[in-house]
Amino acid sequence: MAVQKEATLVRQIIRAAGGHAADVRELVAEHGPEAVTAVLVDEIVSRAPHPVNDVPVLVELAVRSGDALVPRRLAVAQGAPVRRAAPDDDGFVAMRVEYELDELVRELFGPCRERAAGTRGTTLFPYATSGTGHIDTYFLAAQQATATVLAGCTSAKPDLNELTSRYLTPKWGSLHWFTPHYDRHFREYRNEEVRVLEIGIGGYQHPEWGGGSLRMWKHFFHRGLIYGLDIEDKSHAEEQRITTVVGDQNDPGCLTELAARYGPFDIVIDDGSHINEHVRTSFHALFPHVRPGGLYVIEDLWTAYWPGFGGDSDPGKSDLTSLGLVKSLVDSLQHQELPEDSGRSPGYADRHVVGLHVYHNLAFIEKGVNSEGGIPGWIPRDFDALVAASSGGAA
Ligand SMILES: C[S@@+](CC[C@H](N)C(=O)[O-])C[C@H]1O[C@@H](n2cnc3c(N)ncnc32)[C@H](O)[C@@H]1O
């Protein structure tokens, strides 16, 4: 298993942002406003949508901490992502947005707050400083560019469908229609410091493709750490809060090592090879490393029917397929109801699968403690006997 670099300061910032205001102050005192601001600007740049202003402008983000003011300029123009302006960039500064550092830390990395007003100061600069042009042109550019930057300064819940287009992941809109299901099952984890592992970063053997879904999860889980496993080197997809690992999802040793290093995971998503044997190996190796209350997700169940992926076109012969695994989990969920002489000794999945949601090509498996106890042995296992026992002698 080859491992790429790992984040540290951002993890401390996320932790402090979920705590008391004093925790953020202590962290800033320890690391200094410049270092903390650098992490925040990285995050804002990655969350900001594509600019729409065709007149390029600069937006100054001024971050205040006590007497210190850390100004950072962002270049905003249609056709390129928002980026940090070069020190010698003498473009037109259209707007200054000023935040208190602790406020911005909590806005970006704290539990989500819907309040949008009263969190920042703004200064709209006169268009005349740009030298030429008409006031309407610059006013519009300033407005659009500021809106773009401010959209990166929030942790409000994004629209997953929109994020699939922005970050280029095929989880919605062409082959797959997964995002509404993801939104339904993942939204309750958004305010948590989740660790999400996705098997399959994307792009297969292309050296620069892939990483779209990791970026989407990074944006959606604004307090999360995102890990991607791929058989190919996908280190180009690394960024703040995204770690990539090279390894084979069909190698239990590799998966155990990965989980020991980065787990337990709140969510694991299998979007890797979709070879049936691999899907089963990964589930058995990684499900024990999902924390109670977490989710294990399997995409692309269609390969269960295709021999080219080790599947079988006969649904009755699913013993070795991904769908066979999913179907077997229904029995795991209900195992406490089996007759005592069934000969089944409860396995790990029996003891820990507490919910199963199956959609077209997609399954969500809920982890927990599956020991509510079966229907007691003294309850009749025969309909007529049950009616008689339940009718107070009237039957
Ligand atoms: C469908 S793509 C992943 C797409 C990505 N999750 C997204 O939504 O944008 C599948 C990826 O799985 C990787 N893969 C194939 N076999 C694998 C294996 N045995 N172990 C780990 N990754 C594998 C491929 O290299 C490819 O990049």
From Swiss-Prot:
It catalyses: demethylmacrocin + S-adenosyl-L-methionine = macrocin + S-adenosyl-L-homocysteine + H(+). Pfam families: MycE_N. Disruption phenotype: No production of demethylmacrocin. Keywords: Antibiotic biosynthesis, Methyltransferase, S-adenosyl-L-methionine, Transferase. Disulfide bonds: none annotated. Its EC number is 2.1.1.102. Optimum pH is 7.8-8.5. One of its GO terms (biological process) is antibiotic biosynthetic process. GO terms for molecular function: demethylmacrocin O-methyltransferase activity. Pathway: Antibiotic biosynthesis; tylosin biosynthesis. SUPFAM superfamilies: S-adenosyl-L-methionine-dependent methyltransferases. O-methyltransferase that catalyzes the conversion of demethylmacrocin to macrocin, the penultimate step of tylosin antibiotic biosynthesis. Also able to mediate the conversion of demethyllactenocin to lactenocin. This is Demethylmacrocin O-methyltransferase. The gene is tylE.
